[in-house]
Amino acid sequence: MTATIAFAEEAPQNADSIVKTLLAATESGNFAEFQQQGDAAFQAGITKDMFSKVSQQLAPALKGGYDLSFLTSLTQQGYDVYLWKITPNTGKDQFVAKLVLKNGEASGFWIQ
């Protein structure tokens, strides 16, 4: 059995731009900006109330500033999946952001 050593990769510019916009919209509570990043299914699947609850929960950690570190990319069922580590400057919990793209638009976005 052989192993291949992989070196750090960078997120594609489009994915990087979308995740930063989604995080900024989450931080500021800007639902319209958040929705603009996604395809029709993404937009239909996230209500303003759902977004507001998540924004209220995460905004305090994001507003203090954070470091966004790209982790890796995957291909799953024809979708491009990208993962980042979010380290808030508050020194509290870290998060993982998962962005799923199809044809250059967000099809899914999760922060865990």
In which residue ranges do the predicted regions lie?
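Short charge-dense sequence patches
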Residues: 3-9, 46-49, 95, 106-107
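Exposed beta-sheet edge and beta->alpha loop/turn motif
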Residues: 72-112
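Short, low-complexity N-terminal intrinsically disordered segments enriched in polar/charged residues
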Residues: 3-28
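Short C-terminal domain-edge/linker segments immediately following a structured domain
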Residues: 7, 65-67, 99-103
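Intrinsically disordered/low-complexity terminal segments and short unstructured peptides
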Residues: 1-3, 89
